[in-house]
């Protein structure tokens, strides 16, 4: 959930809806324009976080599971929140490789003071041993810029195996 400057609260539902709570009451209609996610197990629409400059740019970030039954992954998108809808939805990160499990996505989002975004990536349960493999996103925390680019001061930036 994320608290808006006006006191409203944005809440994600695993089933795929982004909801608004206003004055301690659920707004009847979900936010429109939310990208489709694949719901099951621990997957669906998972986290929401406001851009550090939300008051001036109205940008939010969502984490969601996407794909089909046999090939799913974690995706992070950013969009402009208009009060009841999302516009200009853009993918900023997609975990690799895909997996066939519906659990252990991670999917938590947090901004650092330098406005880079941290994204937790779960181990996919059946793939937990791959968390030690720097060539996958399993079991990692990824740091990206607000538009999804890799910051020049990221660790392992020039390591070809990563």
Show where each model-derived region lies.
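Short helix/strand-bridging catalytic loops that position acidic/His residues to coordinate divalent metals
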Residues: 125-131, 159-162
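Acidic, Gly/Ser/Thr-rich repeat motifs that build Ca2+-stabilized beta-propeller blades
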Residues: 1-128
